[in-house]
Amino acid sequence: IVYAVDGSDKKIVGIHPSAKKSYEASIFKTLAPDLENVNSSFVDNNFNVNFEEVAKLKPDVVIIWDYQPEVAKKLKELGIPAVSIKYGTLEDIQNGIRLLGKILDKPEQAEALISYHKDSEAYFKQKNASALPNKPKVLYLQNKNLTVAGNNSVNQLMITMTGGENAAKDTKGSWTKVSMEEIMTWDPDIII
């Protein structure tokens, strides 16, 4: 999100390993080649933070999701400012984009990105208005530990916006570990 709002990779000193992995397989590798050297070893895939490594990066601010209050508290104790962005709906993400626009002194770019989000959402809603009544059941697996995108995840929104039904929609929270038996009971049509 910082890159999208700022239009540059120059202010990014660290990113989550999953963001780094996505970067490796995306057009951002061409658009922002310097991100290849950005540190991602200060946090693991489960968002467990090595605070000593964060301090070595000397960030001006750390952007975290709102479900990480203990991380914000520890960063504050270390004198490192943290900004929490609410994770969940597209509106939450858009509010986070707006906040980053203020922090990065790029409010116009933030509003343009939000406008793009809203236009994209409207496009998919219109396209899916006449979708088939039997929506495919889609299961989004995060990792080999059978962690699924639940009803509070952005992935839930993406699945429904594109005409699917989240097979794990009845799970609590954003990400939930489940059993193979649960997956078999859900009988998803598509697994991502």
Per-region residue spans from a language model:
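Short helix-loop-beta junction
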Residues: 155-167
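A short, structured surface patch at a secondary-structure boundary
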Residues: 2-55, 61
